[in-house]
Amino acid sequence: MTEYKSWPLGQLPPEFQRPELDQLKKNGYKFGDPREVVDIFEKKVAKFAGAKYGIAVDCCSHGLFLSLKWYKDVMKMITEHIHIPRYTYCSVPMQIIHAGFKPVFEDVTWSGIYQLRPFDIWDGAVRWTQGMYKSGFHIVSFQLKKRIPIGRGGMILTNDKKAADWFRKMTYDGRDLTISYMDDDFEYCGYHYYMTPEDAARGILLMDQVPNKNLDSGNNRTYSDLSTKRIFNE
């Protein structure tokens, strides 16, 4: 029995459906409401990584943003600066700015994963290997060039249940999906950052094919020097 309230508009007709959910059933996975597939994927990734909880998001960048917002809005941290490598992807300092902090670029040699100091937040976008969970909030990516190339998507890994529950509502417009939409009082002013069931299904199918141990797909030599970019020096 699904814990979710049923889709308000019902199911799509077969000719409009993406194939991943049917492929998942053919591979032996069982689910009722399609949103259960997101749960399956979250639990599968969390177990693979060595974390207690996984919260699927529509991209790694939004996972970083929500992790930063947890520290700012829930933990009420007064830290102003977040220290990151100067050689990384440009969305990382942008999310820091969007979350209300200021990025500080440092010379850091890294591979696969690095910390957004002083917080226990880890950008693990370019690492995918069994047991990879570091600590705190560890965010992974399912972008097209990553080891699990869904095309778009990410996941926040954590051992903190309170944070996991908060993230789950914040990714879906503040909604509690176990309550009917008409009855939900929307506990939080959330974001539209959820992962679709079809993308989660693709992630499951890919995980069942990709090796458990993989080399990092990026490091400090993969990216340009963000400390020289005009947008971060204004």
Q: Where on the chain are the PLM-derived regions?
A:
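Short, conserved clusters of charged catalytic residues that mark active-site
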Residues: 40, 107, 149
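Conserved PLP-binding active-site segment in aminotransferase class I/II-type PLP enzymes
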Residues: 1-77, 99, 163, 194-234
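Conserved alpha-helical elements of sugar-nucleotide-dependent glycosyltransferases
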Residues: 37, 41, 88-91, 183
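Conserved SAM-binding loop
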Residues: 56, 84, 156
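PLP-dependent aminotransferase-like
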Residues: 69-131
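Short, well-ordered alpha-helix to beta-strand connector turns
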Residues: 51-52, 117, 135-137
